Design a protein with these regions (language model features):
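Cytoplasmic helix-loop-helix junction between adjacent transmembrane helices
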Residues: 101-135
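Hydrophobic core of transmembrane alpha-helices in multi-pass small-molecule transporters
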Residues: 14, 83, 93-112, 218, ...
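C-terminal ends and interior cores of transmembrane alpha-helices
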Residues: 78-91, 282-296
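Helix-loop boundary and gating motifs at the non-cytosolic
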Residues: 2-49, 209-217, 221-249, 318, ...
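Juxtamembrane intracellular "pre-TM" segments in multi-pass secondary transporters
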Residues: 1-3, 181-215, 237
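Helix-to-loop junctions at the C-terminal end of transmembrane segments
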Residues: 55-68, 151-152, 259-273, 361-362
């Protein structure tokens, strides 16, 4: 195939996920600077979950059927970038939330449209999409580096607004770049949301192994998203990392993700679905346990080092989950089944994490403003252990391992 097109699609994915990565790690450090109440922080932090649910049930299908992919991307990122600028320069809650929500409602559908555009223009998607998708992970890593120079070691709210401004700048760049992508017309033959397929996918929950995997995915999605709710504040205080290095430190996990994804196929062949997923959840348990028991500045090096566990947490559970659905579920409902699990990962799990962990953090913060991170991080540690036990005892898939593993999950 044309390597120029493949590189364009790779660069498209770099820019796409860089927008998301620009604000994700630091937003829960920024909102307290604006004196938002806890429920307001929880609600604003749940923007992505709200937009994901809307996207899964409406806007993704609307975009697919009515717009050429490249024009939809250009328009969405142009308006979304303007919305991020609005969020950066407002300091009262409601205008901030409305700008941030508008950005989310425009941005979330572009993730699916990006994937659709890539699949439509790759000669061999099974072979080439992994390379394109890796661009998203690289984008998440690269976007943290400008913040080292734009933020201070102890940033003010005025400095911290750069997390949105960087995202806005990338949005504008991607809006223009999208118009250079291959023309991909709307799929007018698509019938929107296949309600029968979704119903069949939900009915699969009657099968014990599917129900167990569904519950475990909800648990793991909650603690995975809880990491992003808590990590910024944890690294800032008590670990005492400079504000401008926090995002860069967390990208160690994305570097590890690239390495782990390269190992995933051989690991699945050797130990199968169940044990690969158990190891993925074990990564969460170990990471949160380290956070709980070593929550002091003198353990900075250890806290930085365990960020590599993100690669195991993500690839060995979430990427394996998507491969499992593609390999085991009936062909006619695989897309709906993927959407069902996406609803947990990007929607319900994220929503629970923002409200629950945000509320627990407020509850376990002293009058002097000191957070009991030991108690706080024991919660996801214990949940991860419960999820591992559930998989170990009750997850009995129809096949032990894939014949030819190979698939790609959404970047995060």
């Amino acid at each position: 195939m044309n390597n120029g097109i493949r590189f364009k699609l790779f660069l498209m994915m770099v820019l796409e996920i860089a927008i998301w990565g620009s604000w994700q790690v630091q937003i829960f450090n920024y909102m307290p600077m604006l004196n938002f109440e806890q429920w307001q922080q929880n609600l604003a932090g749940s923007m992505f979950a709200i937009a994901s649910v809307v996207g899964i049930f409406f806007s993704n299908q609307f975009a697919d059927r009515n717009f050429s992919a490249e024009k939809f991307l250009a328009t969405s990122h142009l308006i979304g970038g303007a919305a991020l600028i609005g969020a950066a320069f407002t300091t009262s809650f409601m205008p901030f939330f409305l700008c941030f929500l508008l950005y989310g409602l425009l941005y979330v559908p572009t993730i699916s449209v990006n994937n659709a555009l890539a699949f439509a223009n790759l000669k061999d998607p099974a072979r080439d999409f992994g390379f394109v998708r890796m661009g998203g992970t690289i984008g998440w890593i690269v976007v943290s580096w400008p913040l080292i120079f734009l933020l201070g070691a102890k940033s003010t709210a005025q400095e911290m607004r750069w997390i949105f401004l960087v995202g806005a700048i990338i949005s504008f760049v991607l809006a223009g770049f999208s118009l250079t992508l291959p023309h991909t017309p709307p799929r007018r033959d698509v019938q929107g949301l296949d309600k029968l397929a979704w119903l069949k996918a939900v009915k699969l929950l009657r099968r014990p192994y599917v129900f167990v995997l569904f519950v475990v995915t909800l648990i793991d999605s909650t603690i995975h998203n809880g990491y992003f709710v808590l990590i910024g504040g944890f690294l800032k205080d008590p670990i005492k990392m400079p504000d401008n290095w926090i995002a860069a430190i967390t990208t160690i996990g994305q570097v590890a993700e690239i390495v782990t994804m390269l190992m995933l196929g051989s690991v699945l062949k050797k130990i199968g679905w169940k044990w690969t997923m158990i190891i993925g959840i074990l990564g969460h348990a170990l990471r949160f346990a380290v956070f709980a028991f070593f929550d002091k500045p003198e353990y900075q090096a250890l806290i930085i080092a365990v960020q590599v566990l993100h690669g195991i947490c993500y690839a060995f559970f979430f990427a394996t989950l998507y491969i499992f659905v593609d390999a085991v579920f009936p062909k006619d409902i695989r897309t709906s089944a993927q959407g069902l699990f996406n609803l947990l990962v990007l929607g319900v799990g994220l929503l629970i994490a923002n409200f629950w962990f945000g509320s627990l953090k407020a509850q376990w913060t002293s009058a002097a403003g000191v957070v009991d991170y030991h108690k706080l991080f024991l919660v996801p540690t214990e949940l991860a252990v419960v999820a591992m036990v559930m998989l170990l005892l009750f997850f009995k898939p129809p096949t032990d391992r894939p014949e030819e593993p190979g698939a790609s999950a959404p970047a995060h």
